[in-house]
Amino acid sequence: LRRRGEAFKTLTPEEVEALVDALVDEYVAENLPGMTVRMDYLIGRIRRNLVGLLGFIQRDLRQSGFRPVAFELRIDDRPDAENPDAPRIDPVQLADGAGHTVRIVGTVDRVDAMPLEKRGKTYLRVVDYKTGGKEFKLKEVYYGLDCQMLLYLFTLERNAQTAFPGATAAGGEYLLADPAPESVDRRELTEEADPAPTYPMNGLLLDDESIYRAMDTKGTGEFVPLSFSAKTGKVLNSKSTLADEAKLGRIRDHLDGLLIDMAENLYSGRIDAEPL
């Protein structure tokens, strides 16, 4: 995406495969000299999965109103030592009331944006790539778990107004980049069958139909953590996957409170293994 830009959407399968080969070969040459047989096998597996993953991302971008605008975006007020000109967003800073400051720093895998001039807003979606199985559970966020993606999202909403005028949280999604293979009944298979691999996405989205529909324009449920009625097109499972602006604000404020509590405990010498 970074190298091909908008042209990435129109690459043929053969061109995608060639791009993967070039990128993997480049990485191996720079980082993995003298590979073992086992490592060579694992690299081959990575190549195959990347071809499928990029195909999925192509399908997503072809139908989505959102566009990737940043990759590995640093949230930090200090320049990167290796690349001082790299784009970055200032972190949120919270005061604990005792003279200490909490700074939220990190790196966002991908940021997608959809400007809506009529509303004077730029809606932002954070995409967090994960391997294996990863399920977003909002109830765990309230206990201080699985907070990273939302912390990044709320940081962008508060501190990325210069880069993205009217920055507004549209949601965050985990993209399972190396999911477990799906079980398929052999009776459903044919010699010609070669279904495109799917990569589950789950997370929390803004409860605004025009926004989540822009992420999945045909209502397939393939690109958002939602199920749509085949008859009405309405969302069926919205309780834990959609939140209106007021609810997102409450979640943001709750996370701020958790971070301040953590800081107070650390400075007081209370470092229990919680929550576990």
Which residues fall in each region the model found?
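Structural signature of nuclease core domains in nucleic-acid processing machines
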Residues: 1-276
